[in-house]
Amino acid sequence: MLAVAVLAAGKGTRMKSALPKVLQPLAGATLVERVLASARNLAPERRLLIVGHQAERVEAQLSSNGGLEFVLQQPQNGTGHAVQQLLAPLQGFQGELLVLNGDVPLLRAETIEALVSTHRSSQADVTLLTARLDDPTGYGRVFADANGRVSAIIEHRDCSDEQRSNNLTNAGIYCFNWGKLAEVLPQLSTDNDQGELYLTDTVQLLDVAMQMEVSDPDEVNGINNRRQLAQCEGVLQQRLRDHWMDEGVTFVDPASCTLSEDCSFGCDVVIEPQTHLRGACRIGDNCRLGPGSLLDNAELGCDVTVVQSVVRDARVGNDVAIGPFAHIRPATDVGDSCKIGNFVEIKKSVIAAGSKVNHLSYIGDAELGANVNVGAGTITANFDGTNKHLTVIGEGSKTGANSVLVAPVVIGKNVTIGAGSTITKAVPDGSLAIGRAKQLTKEGWDRNTQAAQS
């Protein structure tokens, strides 16, 4: 049996944030959510999150993470003290305990699985993950023989100069025999510079401790400040881009683009510079995104172009051109072969196949039929000051430039709206509707004379 415990009680003072450190976002998910996800494939019998600082906020964020048990550490007095809080909830548990840190979000699932497998095959009391760092400053040093058997872990601040020359470091990730660990946890001492209970001290209290060195030190990067958060974001983004380039996606300037792990792409997608995808974006074959575009939970069909535009929580069909400078807002559904042009905003609307909204328009709370042509400057006036109302435009209809459709209003099929019209009443199929003031022309108008007389 396996239990997984994640240490998530710390304040994260160096982040200088009102948000708990483990809830800081990284590529669309919080740090602690990424840590929990990395152990998902192990299918542990127990999953425990040790909380402390802003415990209620952390628990609220993770309340939908099924089967997660919350254990309070109050006050926070070191990693050993944190794991001591498991003595009661894991009383009688028989198996291994995997201890992860809530601020180490880059650990791969494969590495965790290998650590557990190594621990089980070695039959050690504890197996810890280690990394060789070019600059090990601040990390505890691991001292082990050629067979991987660990004799000691010494925190950086407690190391002598000679001991600090060792660059094999403790990653703070352990797989314990829980029964053996439970026996020695009460023996931990605060006799160190910090006056805290170190989990690392259990290594000297247990009979057999082994280490497994991680192949990529980036995996065990911890996050204590904004710089380290940015560095981890860069590592994770590079992983995501590398994965999708291997799957056939072209990034014209990879370093200028960001993704979330929930994105998916079809074949021959091209992503131009300064384009960002967030949330669960679904991008079909032969799409071209950017430059300078933002997509957030967007679903795009095949052969779609999005140039210098924003698409949020919306669906776009096949063979659609969007932009430049268009804003497709939530709950919008754009059908096949549509054109959404420059400086167009669409909100909570359905645009049926073949329709065009080419210039300078606002379409909100509307239903457009197939092959509608919306003239430049057309506005659906959907808000009466209290409620939003629906505009319906039937298939084949055309609105002239600078038209205002005051909702609620229904425009029938194959209707023509004259330029500059304000439409407040329903227009039947096949009609021409004009609703504008009569033009007044005064010939021989001398503006200077008129100004002097006024």
Swiss-Prot record:
Enzyme Commission number(s) from the entry: 2.7.7.23, 2.3.1.157
Co-factor note (free text): Binds 1 Mg(2+) ion per subunit.
Catalytic activity: alpha-D-glucosamine 1-phosphate + acetyl-CoA = N-acetyl-alpha-D-glucosamine 1-phosphate + CoA + H(+); N-acetyl-alpha-D-glucosamine 1-phosphate + UTP + H(+) = UDP-N-acetyl-alpha-D-glucosamine + diphosphate
UniProt-annotated catalytic positions: 359 (proton acceptor)
Binding locations of acetyl-CoA: 376, 419, 436
Ranges for region Linker: 227-247
GO molecular function, one term: magnesium ion binding
Ranges where the record places region Pyrophosphorylase: 1-226
Subcellular location(s) of the protein: Cytoplasm
Residues engaged in binding UDP-N-acetyl-alpha-D-glucosamine: 7-10, 21, 73, 78-79, 140, 155, 170, 224, 329, 347, 362, 373
A cellular component term, taken from the record's GO annotations: carboxysome
Region (N-acetyltransferase): 248-454
Pfam families in the cross-refs: Hexapep (PF00132), NTP_transf_3 (PF12804)
UniProt: Mg(2+) binding residues: 103, 224
Gene Ontology biological process terms from the UniProt entry: cell morphogenesis; cell wall organization; lipid A biosynthetic process; peptidoglycan biosynthetic process; regulation of cell shape; UDP-N-acetylglucosamine biosynthetic process
Cofactor(s) essential for the protein: Mg(2+)
Alphabetic keyword roster: Acyltransferase, Cell shape, Cell wall biogenesis/degradation, Cytoplasm, Magnesium, Metal-binding, Multifunctional enzyme, Nucleotidyltransferase, Peptidoglycan synthesis, Repeat, Transferase
Subunit structure: Homotrimer.
Family in the record: In the N-terminal section; belongs to the N-acetylglucosamine-1-phosphate uridyltransferase family.
Task of the protein: Catalyzes the last two sequential reactions in the de novo biosynthetic pathway for UDP-N-acetylglucosamine (UDP-GlcNAc). The C-terminal domain catalyzes the transfer of acetyl group from acetyl coenzyme A to glucosamine-1-phosphate (GlcN-1-P) to produce N-acetylglucosamine-1-phosphate (GlcNAc-1-P), which is converted into UDP-GlcNAc by the transfer of uridine 5-monophosphate (from uridine 5-triphosphate), a reaction catalyzed by the N-terminal domain.
PANTHER family: BIFUNCTIONAL PROTEIN GLMU, NUCLEOTIDYL TRANSFERASE
Name listed for the protein in its UniProt record: Bifunctional protein GlmU
Organism of origin: Synechococcus sp. (strain CC9311)
Gene: glmU
